[in-house]
Amino acid sequence: MRISNSFYIIILTLCFFLSFVAKAEESSFFNQKIEEGALSSNAAMREGTQHMLSTFNKNPKKYTPENIENFDMKFEKGLDDICANCRYDVKFNNKQNPNLPLFEEFKSYNSETWSKIANDKGFIQQFKSYLQTSGVKNIDDLAYVINSNKANINEVKQAFKEVLKRNTDEIFKTNPNIWKQFDRVDGTGKINSLKNFKDLVEDISFDTKHPIFNFIKAE
């Protein structure tokens, strides 16, 4: 009997789900959220959940119930309520483990989808929601975990570079303090204005090796 790819993905996702549940029986809310994604009729959500659980399975010491504060929840309402329905994937208890970011977002996009994010309003609104959330003080408090089987990390960094170039003003103004950790392009100090930020993202030397993209991880 030939098994379809979609059926295989569902079975694999359930295997990862059951493995995680076995280690976190006391956390019924977490289990419910994972199950909703694993069994979703939405293929993108289902594959994203599979990618998340696959990453959990590869890094069991990182993704323990003690380290995870919450799953798949709406962002706290910001001052300007950027995106009322935007959600995050994982919120860590980084007081328990300060080596962890505060948030992780799992994306299982292919190369073609990544190439379009600079014009995707929903994607940009979610990204801005992460930037403005209480507790996010620098870019290291955030991690986007991509599926390396579907896209190359340099392609994804290039896509985020386009996001910054095409949406410079709104992204900077969402949380100007985040960008203060990075040097000005002329080497005279740290970024402390929109002009400094524009100068950086528009400079010919600004490429995917810049530390501004270190929040993008591949699994």
Description of each model-found segment:
Residues 165-219:
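Non-catalytic C-terminal interaction segments of nucleic acid-processing enzymes
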Residues 99-101, 106-173:
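Catalytic cores of nucleic-acid endonucleases
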Residues 26-27, 49, 120-124, 139, ...:
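Short amphipathic alpha-helical segments that mediate assembly, nucleic-acid/protein binding
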Residues 1-10:
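Bacterial N-terminal signal peptides that target proteins for export
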Residues 9-19:
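Bacterial N-terminal signal peptides
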Residues 80-105:
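Active-site beta-strand-loop-beta-strand hairpin of nuclease catalytic cores
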Residues 25-83:
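Acidic-basic catalytic patches of nuclease active cores, encompassing PD-(D/E)XK
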Residues 20-24:
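Sec/Tat signal peptide C-region and signal peptidase I cleavage site
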